[in-house]
């Protein structure tokens, strides 16, 4: 990411309105939102069209280091959007920003997840890909602590992994899977998408979202 430009609040509100009035989605994911006003407008609009599962992926910084959330927007994220969520899916840097604590271990992930859980969502999935060793994600809920371990794939092409797994979780919830199975299936999916990712250009390449539909996998 080298540059970003915000859409107007009006077009974002209209997009939500048109989709929700047409198909009444069972699950909705909110990803990158950059400004305090857009966050507030999204929350106000979603209040008019409640869904069963709201997944919030608090995207803040791109893989290339580009800031995607204005500093002044963090408070609205915490105050308005996170409390509405069925599940919040921060990675380590995002969770550190939200909780103002350093996260270096799985136990730290649990502590940070509980801080975010107290902000109002039903579940928090702490994505541990930034830690060393196996890819360990931690699901925290009321009286729940579940560890999901996954294979670490030694490839540089991980652009979009966080957005992809949160979208996959949203899709599995909409299909009727419970929260644990939605996460398990989504982790399997993103692991394979990274394994068969694309070498394009000189930067961090994209994962291969459609690897299942190709007879010959791209390596």
Where are these regions (language model features)?
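Short pre-catalytic strand/loop immediately N-terminal to key active-site residues, enriched for Gly-Thr
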Residues: 145-159
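Conserved phosphate/ATP/ADP-binding segment of small-molecule kinases
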Residues: 71-145
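Charged C-terminal helix
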Residues: 181-219
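Active-site-adjacent loop and "lid" segments of alpha/beta metabolic enzymes
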Residues: 1-12, 64-71, 131-139, 159, ...
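Short, small-residue alpha-helix embedded
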Residues: 97, 155-179
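Short, charged, surface-exposed loops that flank catalytic or proteolytic processing sites
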Residues: 102-109, 174-184
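Conserved N-terminal subdomain of the carbohydrate kinase-like
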Residues: 1-63, 67
């Amino acid at each position: 990411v080298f540059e970003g430009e915000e859409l107007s609040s009006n077009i974002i509100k209209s997009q939500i309105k048109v989709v929700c009035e047409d198909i009444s989605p069972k699950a909705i994911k909110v990803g990158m939102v950059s400004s305090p006003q857009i966050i507030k407008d999204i929350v106000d609009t979603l209040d008019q069209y409640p869904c069963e599962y709201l997944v919030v992926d608090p995207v803040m910084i791109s893989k290339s280091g580009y800031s995607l959330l204005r500093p002044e927007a963090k408070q609205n994220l915490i105050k308005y959007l996170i409390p509405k969520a069925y599940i919040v899916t921060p990675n380590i840097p995002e969770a550190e920003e939200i909780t103002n604590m350093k996260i270096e271990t799985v136990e730290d992930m649990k502590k940070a997840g509980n801080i975010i859980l107290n902000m109002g969502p039903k579940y928090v999935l702490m994505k541990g890909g930034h830690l060393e060793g196996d890819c360990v994600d931690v699901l925290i809920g009321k009286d729940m602590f579940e560890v999901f371990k996954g294979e670490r794939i030694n490839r540089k092409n991980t652009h979009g992994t966080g957005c992809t797994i949160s979208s996959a979780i949203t899709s599995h919830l909409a299909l009727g899977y419970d929260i644990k199975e939605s996460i398990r299936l989504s982790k399997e999916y993103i692991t394979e998408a990274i394994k068969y990712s694309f070498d394009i250009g000189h930067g961090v390449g994209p994962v291969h979202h459609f690897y299942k539909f190709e007879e010959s996998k791209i390596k």
